[in-house]
UniProtKB/Swiss-Prot annotation:
Native species: Cutibacterium acnes (strain DSM 16379 / KPA171202) (Propionibacterium acnes)
Protein name listed in UniProt: DNA-directed RNA polymerase subunit beta
Gene Ontology CC annotation, any one: DNA-directed RNA polymerase complex
Family statement: Belongs to the RNA polymerase beta chain family.
Keyword Transcription included in the entry's annotation: yes
Species lineage: Bacteria, Bacillati, Actinomycetota, Actinomycetes, Propionibacteriales
Molecular function in Gene Ontology: DNA binding; DNA-directed RNA polymerase activity; ribonucleoside binding
Gene: rpoB
Region (Disordered): 1132-1159
Length: 1159
């Protein structure tokens, strides 16, 4: 199972790619693997392309046997072949699948709302078994969605990700549970296939061995063995040493022969059906021994062989009698308390119950396998169609094409990509969000757990997660622990188990040979930590080494007993967690928030890489594909905003096209900027262009800001943040957001809709920005209610007046009755039109049925930071901006530099995320630089050894997770930082400075911690949340305003608020709120009229909710009458319609909408 490779050393303190200065002390023999391999390699295996084939050939050349030599599609076509008719006179088989080129490129598919797919063809052979005649044909199976180079799929124009699923592996499992009625333990064994019926053995409190077939009624195991053809003597010969089997055999009264046993089993499995020996034999055969009905899969066979000590071939994917016998032996040994089962010439079998949450028993279904399973479903449906057609068609006229109906296959694929819980709309907030989404592991989904039934155990961190699944990064809320993230160095093997790399240790000497181990292999070894001290020869420096042994227990052992050592201190965490500097100083729950909030950071207009990073920034940005890298070495010929031309050394020319202002799935802006100049020399892998949230090829989610930890006038109470006006005016935290607005012109029953500039009852001012076709011009500034696309819809014919009839008789044309259904800017939005796309059936564009024309308008909005926006650091330290102070009012340093941001110091101690304080100090050190030529102490000696002696200002530092800058180094470097031009040190050796109050110029009484912190602007922007309504839509039944910004709803004045009004005795205000401001329908129309005309507000009437209550009571056969003060009955049917039509007022309209009332 284990794969090895020898790695090269990399001991430089300055990264050759990003130029970061690293404080790492531990030599890592292995680079982080490509972070998208989880997705890309799995899909390559499925389609069996050249990349996959070359990897297989290389692995076979190395002599490895743990790899798949068949592609996923090849496996599935072999599995279904041959399809035979019921009389087995003819068969259909498939081989040699191939793809043709996709119809459209990735960009065209996004533009046209189509799926990026390639036509899949397969050679189908029809064989007449009687004449042995073969007809061969190439058959089209359907359009097969392809994965883009970034590991995503384009489905109907949107980018989607298929998430890998964590499921229980097929195999054999032994469990020990306490009996509720007695103090005995009950031992069970479950044989779980990939598909097919379960087989369960159990030893109950009476010490009898029972078996359960396909979760039906329990029966004695000896009956099952007899049904398989065993005699009582043979059972005693094989299992005579087990008392429980002998007891069970004694209880088998009346079941002696195989026939009796089969009938007995059939009665329990199919009660009510007449039993027969053949039917029983067939049923048992289909349950466990028919490859069409039962499949352990290779992984199931591998697990059973491993657990029970068998050596059956991997292609034996149904149960065998050997499996059943070995499982019974094992469960009996477990019941008897036997520790090991000896085997001749091989390792002994350890007898112990299984831990279902162990990663040796949970495997990943990656993209390829998930699609393969879906294809299997589609092909099995197609198989039924083929069989039916074989029986109905003339055998002479049959060709493969006439037998095959591809609809079930294409429907299965479409259903999976469109509606499956595991095919998700890609989180595209920033490159890290994309990366994390592609590396996500979900225990939910079809065949997995459901969040309601998942208990604590399955959600908890398990020792076997080490190096495989991140213990930190998981969502907060109901999915906690069910959704995880793949660890940085982990990979998935051919069986779907997650492997993690270790350095091999031979007699206390740590080699650079890297071995990948699965969780159950790792359990057998003694493993040292990555930070175990080594001498110059690579031997352990200490005689006893801290290690972890079986079940993750820590212990100290002699160095000669160590088998392996971790390759890196960060191998246990995911990419997002590995981006948090000083993670080791943060509390786990805050680190979780920090990892999750980095994914919510919005790409900024001006990006800046962090002063204090972890060294993972470059790999993350490059692997996700947002940074354009040079594919060949050469020199730059020309550079423009959207094209880079390179003359390559091999005499060829390459052009790189850059993305410009494209909308992401999250509504953020994807824009690339060139990094190279004309004439510049580039090597392979040189970053040519930055993408969103990247800076010189490094991930840059936020900005470095000069932070002070101090209270300020109570404005940073409860984590609120005070910001300097400079951040607003210099566009430090400004982002661009792009909204897409779409309208289509359809055929209606009354005629076709039309996109036009000629809109009834609209002033010329409103049409100023529209072109002659009624579509807004690019560059126009638009606000709420402005028309983007003019559209009219035909109205129903109305009764004509005599005058109109006369005009029509003279001019001979129909009066044009249309209503305005134009696309308008929704409420609360504004911006600049940056793009218009027009699709028309006349130009050959494919549109939905009944749609003649579709127009898409892109509106970009520049959002400066404002009060109410949410900011966060990388340590789970989040807050909302409460005040933006003028620069002159901000506290300033002794040299006059005002700070950018004021944070509350009380946000640190109770949250236990001290990493932010260390980041702030190291940020100041990075900003000011240092010179430790004269410094003394071990810390200075170590930094001098790696060449970090005189570092300039504004340097970028890396402090890797669990191997970063120490407290001694930070306090030492604060002492030896470069002074200002005046020769003074602004920040003392304790990291604090004397700050002055910007309003008075007086120094604050205490010194304040000051330094540079990396702050992120999160997607929770106040512009998306703030909302107000004057008039708007009402609910159909209650006639009360709708709720929520999306429905343009009102603010609910709830039960408790009514109590508050009652408490204050504000009777008139309360009456207004409960009637005319809510659901007194005629009243609110009259009030609107009174306000317009400047009259007094009329008396409120009866609210609609009261009428609904009366109706409810009438439905219970209670005749409720409402009387006025004179005792006369009030008619509740009201005159709301009369009032509305009389006044010509409709206050139920939504601004910018054409619907009169919403439900």
């Amino acid at each position: 199972m284990a794969a090895t490779r020898t790695a090269s050393k990399n001991t430089s303190a300055i990264s050759p790619q990003s130029g970061r200065i690293s404080f790492a002390k531990i030599h890592e023999p292995l680079e982080v693997p490509n972070l998208l391999d989880l997705q890309v390699e799995s899909f390559n295996w499925l389609v069996g392309n050249e990349i996959w084939q070359s990897r297989v050939d290389a692995a076979l050349a190395e002599g490895r046997t743990d790899i798949n030599t068949k592609s996923g599609l090849e496996e599935i076509f072999e599995e279904i072949s041959p399809i035979e008719d019921y009389s087995q006179t003819m068969s259909l088989s498939f081989r040699d699948h191939r793809f043709e080129d996709p119809k459209h490129s990735v960009d065209e598919c996004k533009d046209r709302d189509t799926t990026y797919a390639a036509p899949l063809f397969v050679t189908a052979e029809f064989m007449n078994n009687e004449t042995e005649e073969i007809k061969s044909q190439t058959v089209f199976i359907g359009d097969f969605p392809l994965m883009t180079s970034k590991g995503t799929f384009i489905i109907n124009g949107t980018e989607r990700v298929v998430v890998s699923q964590l499921v229980r592996s097929p195999g054999v499992y032994f469990e020990k549970t306490a009996d509720k009625t007695s103090d005995k333990d009950i031992f069970t064994c479950k044989v779980i296939p990939s598909r097919g019926a379960w087989l369960e053995f159990a030893i109950d409190k009476r010490d009898t061995v029972g078996v359960r077939l396909d979760r039906k009624r329990k029966q004695n195991v000896t009956v099952f063995l007899k049904a398989l053809g065993w005699t009582a003597d043979r059972i005693l010969e094989e299992f005579g040493t087990h008392e429980s089997i002998r007891q069970t055999l004694e209880k088998d009264h009346g079941v002696e022969t195989q026939d009796q046993a089969l009938l007995d089993i059939y009665k329990k499995l199919r009660p009510g059906e007449p039993p027969s020996r053949d039917a029983a034999q067939q049923l048992l055969e289909n349950y466990y021994f028919n490859p069409k009905r039962y499949d352990l899969a290779k992984v199931g066979r591998y697990k059973i062989n491993k657990k029970l000590g068998l050596s059956l071939p991997f292609d034996q994917q149904v149960l065998t009698v050997d499996d059943i016998v070995a499982a019974i032996h094992f469960v009996c040994a477990l019941h008897e308390g036997t520790a090991i089962l000896p085997r001749e010439g091989q390792d002994d079998i350890v007898v112990e119950p299984d831990d279902i949450d162990h990663f040796g028993n949970r495997r990943l279904r990656t993209v390829g396998e998930l699609i393969q399973n879906q294809l299997r479903t589609g092909l099995s449906r197609m198989e039924r169609v083929v069989r039916d057609r074989m029986t109905t068609q003339d055998i002479e006229a049959i060709t493969p094409q006439t037998l095959i109906n591809i609809r079930p296959v294409t429907a299965a694929i479409k259903e999976f990509f469109g509606t499956s819980q595991l095919s998700q709309f890609m989180d595209q907030n920033n490159p890290l969000a994309e990366m994390t989404h592609k590396r996500r592991l979900s225990a939910l989904g079809p065949g997995g757990l459901s969040r309601d039934r998942a208990g604590m155990e399955v959600r908890d961190v398990h020792p076997s997660h080490y190096g495989r699944m991140c213990p930190i990064e998981t969502p907060e809320g109901p999915n906690i622990g069910l959704i995880g993230s793949l660890a940085s160095f982990a990979r998935v093997n051919a069986f779907g188990f997650i492997e993690t790399p270790y350095r091999k240790v031979v007699d206390g000497h740590v080699t650079d040979e890297v071995v990948y181990l699965t969780a159950d292999e790792e359990d057998r070894h003694v493993i040292a930590q990555a930070n175990a001290k080594l001498d110059d020869d690579g031997h352990f420096a200490n005689d006893r080494v801290l290690v972890r042994q079986r079940h993750g227990e820590a212990d100290e052992v002699p160095s000669s007993e160590v088998d392996y050592m971790d390759v890196s201190p960060r191998q246990m965490v995911s990419v997002a967690s590995a981006l948090i500097p000083f993670l080791e100083h943060d509390d786990a729950s805050r680190a979780l928030m920090g990892a999750n909030m980095q994914r919510q950071a919005v790409p900024l207009v001006r990006t800046e890489a962090p002063f204090v990073g972890t060294g993972m920034e470059y790999r993350c940005a490059v692997d996700v594909g947002d940074v354009t890298l040079a594919e060949k070495a050469g020199s730059v010929l020309s550079v423009s905003a959207d094209l880079i031309d390179i003359a390559c050394d091999d005499g060829t020319y390459q052009t790189y096209k850059l993305e410009k202002f494209r909308r992401s799935n999250a509504g953020t802006c994807i824009n690339q900027r060139p990094l190279v100049k004309v004439g510049q020399r580039v090597e392979v892998g040189t970053p040519l262009a930055d993408g969103p949230s990247t800076d010189n090829g490094e991930l840059a989610l936020g900005r470095n800001m000069l932070a002070a930890f101090m209270p300020w006038q109570g404005l940073n109470y409860e984590d609120a943040i005070i910001l300097s006006q400079r951040i607003v005016s210099d566009d430090v935290l400004t982002s661009i957001h792009i909204e897409e607005h779409e309208v289509d012109a359809r055929d209606t029953k009354l005629g076709a809709e039309e996109i036009t500039r000629d809109i009834p009852n609209v002033s010329e001012d409103m049409l100023a920005n529209l072109d002659e076709n009624g579509i807004v011009r690019i560059g126009a500034e638009v606000g709420t209610g402005d028309i983007l696309v003019g559209k009219v819809t035909p109205k129903g014919e109305t009764e004509l007046t005599p005058e109109e009839r006369l005009l029509r008789a003279i001019f001979g044309e129909k009066a044009r009755e249309v209503r305005d259904t134009s696309l308008k800017v929704p409420h609360g939005e504004e911006g600049t039109v940056i793009g218009v796309r027009i699709f028309d059936t006349e130009n050959g564009d494919e549109l939905a049925p009944g749609v003649n024309q579709m127009v898409r308008v892109y509106v970009a909005q520049k959002r400066k930071i404002s009060i109410g926006d949410k900011l966060a650091g990388r340590h789970g330290n989040k807050g909302v901006i409460s005040k933006i102070l003028p620069v002159e009012d901000m506290p300033f340093l002794p040299d006059g530099t005002p700070v950018d941001i004021i944070l509350n110091p009380l946000g640190v101690p109770s949250r236990m995320n001290v990493g932010q304080v260390l980041e702030m100090h190291l940020g100041w050190i990075a900003h000011s630089g240092w010179d430790i030529t004269q410094a003394e102490g071990d810390w200075a000696e170590r930094l001098r050894e790696v060449g970090l002696i005189d570092i300039p200002e504004e340097s970028r530092l890396a402090t890797p997770v669990f191997d970063g800058a120490t407290e001694q180094e930070i306090t030492g470097l604060l002492q030896y930082g470069h002074p200002t031009r005046d020769g003074e040190m602004l920040v003392d050796t304790d990291g604090k400075a004397t700050l002055f109050d910007g309003r008075t110029g007086e120094p604050f009484p205490s010194k304040v911690g000051v330094g540079y912190m990396y702050m992120l602007k999160l997607h929770h922007l106040v512009d998306d949340k703030i909302h107000a309504r004057s008039t708007g839509p009402y609910s159909m039944i209650t006639q009360q305003p709708l709720g929520g910004k999306a429905q343009f709803g009102g603010q609910r004045f709830g039960e408790m608020e009514v109590w508050a009004m009652e408490a204050y005795g504000a009777a008139w205000a309360l009456q207004e709120l409960l009637t005319i401001k809510s659901d007194d329908v005629p009243g609110r129309v009259k009030v609107y009229e009174a306000i317009v005309k400047g009259e007094n507000i009329p008396e409120p009437g009866i609210p609609e909710s009261f009428k609904v209550l009366v109706k409810e009571m009438k439905s219970l056969c209670l005749n409720v009458e409402v009387l006025n003060s004179e005792g006369q009955e009030i008619d509740l049917r009201g005159s709301e319609e009369d009032t509305r039509s009389g006044l010509g007022i409709d206050i139920g309209r939504r601004p910018g909408a054409d619907n009169a009332m919403a439900d």
